[in-house]
Design a protein with these regions (language model features):
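C-terminal motif of bacterial Sec signal peptides marking the signal peptidase cleavage site
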Residues: 14-17
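Bacterial N-terminal signal peptides that target proteins for export
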Residues: 1-7
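Bacterial signal peptide processing site
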Residues: 19-22
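Mature extracytoplasmic or organellar-lumen-exposed domains after removal of signal/transit peptides
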Residues: 24-341
Length: 341
């Protein structure tokens, strides 16, 4: 693997990702292409998500074997898996085989609590579910949201009737691990290697833009109208970790920017613009609220204001990418399919 084009910060993030997956031999494609620094980060994110998903399936297996009713380890591993997913969430650029797994990994937004209704029905069926059978069911019972319901919803039988819950929990967690393996496998090839420099540049800015807009949607839906928030539209409202998820989104986007775009802007003597974008990312991370739950923040006027303040910073970052970076590079950003409902 060649790290020549990586900035020091991005290099540290890549090395950290390598260590977190526990892999000594990277399966990332090794080529000499302008997209390579970004591709390396994307592959490592996919590899980390696979490793965490495998760990989550193993944690459920051990829990169901021991039935010790201690869900703390399960919850910790679920959160680590969710955090790993944040680096890939909201993507619309990359291998089609990876992108098509997004809804299977996470069903959100869930405007009508479909996950709650479907999971309540699933766990009350007296049968064992294999990963293959779960994969044929609704996406609402397949991924991270289904396992969050299992771990945090008061209607879940995981602690009150673990034997019953494990009939579906094992299949769901293994199905998630299977989907993560498909995603990691798809990222073993650089999807951008045939692009010329101009095409890649447009793709790169769009990649950042798509993920940013998805992150912003995770705030606009629950923020709704001033004075009329919709806290149940928050991602991970059951586990109350939505703000932690969003911070992980921002940190992943920051790493993608630093991997190459920051250097490209500086090479074109757009140093002042590069500094402003870099500072905006850093400011977002440094001022992120300590409160882990957007659901809880929206219960008070002060919390709502704090959440809105962070959203405005994301909006400023969007302006920098769309109106300044894209214009400076001659990139035209098209319609984002995640916009609207």
């Amino acid at each position: 693997m060649t790290f020549k084009s990586l900035t020091p910060v991005a290099l540290a993030l890549v090395l950290s990702a390598c260590q977190s997956t526990g892999m000594s031999d990277s399966k990332a494609e090794q080529i000499n292409h302008v997209s390579q620094p970004v591709y390396v980060l994307e592959y490592q994110s996919a590899a980390r998500f696979k490793a965490e998903s495998d760990n989550l399936a193993l944690a459920f297996s051990r829990y169901c074997e021991q039935a010790d009713l201690d869900t703390d380890k399960l919850k910790t591993q679920w959160h680590q898996t969710m955090t790993a997913w944040m680096a890939l969430q909201g993507q619309e650029r990359g291998p089609a085989a990876a992108l098509e797994q997004s809804w299977n990994v996470q069903f959100w937004p869930d405007k009508k609590n479909t996950t709650g209704r479907k999971m309540a029905s699933l766990v009350h069926q007296d049968r064992e579910w294999t990963a293959e059978q779960i994969a044929q069911q609704s996406v609402t019972v397949q991924g991270l949201g289904a396992l969050e319901w299992m771990l945090y919803d008061p209607k879940s039988p995981l602690t009150s009737a673990p034997k019953s819950a494990c009939q579906s929990a094992l299949g769901i967690s293994q199905n998630l691990a299977d989907k993560a393996a498909l995603i990691e496998s798809a990222w073993q090839q650089n999807p951008w290697k045939t692009m010329d420099d101009a095409t890649w540049e447009s793709e790169y800015v769009a990649l950042l833009s798509n993920q940013l807009e998805h992150a912003m949607s995770k705030m606009t839906r629950p923020l709704a109208n001033v004075g009329q928030p919709r806290p149940y539209f928050s991602e991970s409202w059951r586990s109350k970790t939505s703000m932690l998820n969003l911070k992980a989104n921002v940190e992943a986007m920051q790493a993608l920017y630093l991997a190459s775009l920051d250097g490209q802007l500086r090479e074109r003597n757009l140093v002042e613009l590069a500094d402003r974008v870099k500072t905006q990312y850093a400011n977002l991370v440094d001022t992120w609220p300590a409160e882990p739950s957007l659901f809880d923040m929206l219960q008070t006027k002060e919390g709502y204001r704090d959440a809105l303040s962070q959203y405005n910073k994301l909006d400023q970052l969007k302006y920098l990418l769309h109106e300044e970076v894209a214009v400076a590079l001659g990139v035209v950003l098209g319609f984002n399919s995640s916009d609207g409902d």
